[in-house]
Design a protein with these regions (language model features):
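Electropositive, glycine-dotted interaction segments
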Residues: 1-11, 22-23
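Active-site-adjacent bridging/hinge elements
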Residues: 13-16
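Switch/communication elements of ASCE P-loop NTPase nucleotide-binding domains
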Residues: 19-154
Length: 164
C-alpha cells in the first residue's frame, strides 16, 4: 500500500525491456528517477512474487539517492517486509537519518529482536572488524554526530554572525 502511493503504476516487460505504466502512459523503467528506482525494484519483486518468506535482500546504501523524507518511507517499507513477510535484509548505510529511521520503525513495529546491527572498526592497513552494536545503538549515533559536529564547526567559523 505504501509502495502504491509512491509508485502508483504497474510494470511490464516488452521487447524494449522493462516499462512502467501509469494512467495510460508508458515509460521505459530506466528513465525513472534514480531515487524512484529503489521503490520500483521492491514493488516489482513483490508484484512478481519474488520476495517471500526467507528471501534475502542485500541492499547497499539504498537511501543514497533519496530525500530524507523518502528515506523514512523506505525504511518503514523495509521493516514491514521483515515483519509481514519474514524477509531477511542485509543492509549497509552511511546515513544517520536512515539508520535512525530503521531503528525507529523496528521499535514501532516491535521487531527489535529480529535484527542485529554491526559497525566497522578500522584496524589499519585496510582491515576492519565488524563489531556487534545491537545493544548499544548510541555508539553508532555518537560516531555520526562527530562528523556532523566537525563540519558544523567549520561552517560556523566562516559564517558572519549577522548572517545567521
Amino acid at each position: 500500500e505504501k509502495l502504491d502511493k509512491i509508485i502508483p503504476g504497474t510494470f511490464g516487460k516488452t521487447n524494449d525491456g522493462l516499462v512502467y505504466y501509469k494512467d495510460g502512459v508508458r515509460l521505459n523503467a530506466s528513465n525513472l528517477a534514480t531515487g524512484s528506482k529503489m521503490f520500483a525494484i521492491i514493488k516489482m519483486l513483490l508484484d512478481t512474487g519474488r520476495i517471500k518468506k526467507q528471501t534475502l535482500l542485500v541492499l547497499d546504501e539504498p537511501e543514497s539517492h533519496l530525500h530524507p523524507q523518502w528515506q523514512n518511507v523506505f525504511a518503514e517499507i523495509i521493516v514491514l517486509l521483515v515483519k509481514e513477510l519474514g524477509v531477511k535484509i542485509l543492509l549497509t548505510t552511511h546515513s544517520p537519518n536512515f539508520m535512525l529511521a530503521i531503528d525507529a520503525f523496528m521499535r514501532k513495529y516491535n521487531i527489535n529482536d529480529k535484527s542485529n546491527f554491526y559497525q566497522t572498526k578500522n584496524l589499519g592497513d585496510g582491515f576492519v572488524e565488524y563489531v556487534d552494536v545491537t545493544n548499544n545503538m548510541e555508539k553508532i549515533y555518537q560516531d555520526f554526530l562527530v562528523y556532523l559536529t566537525e563540519v558544523k564547526s567549520i561552517h560556523d567559523s566562516f559564517t558572519d554572525p549577522e548572517d545567521a
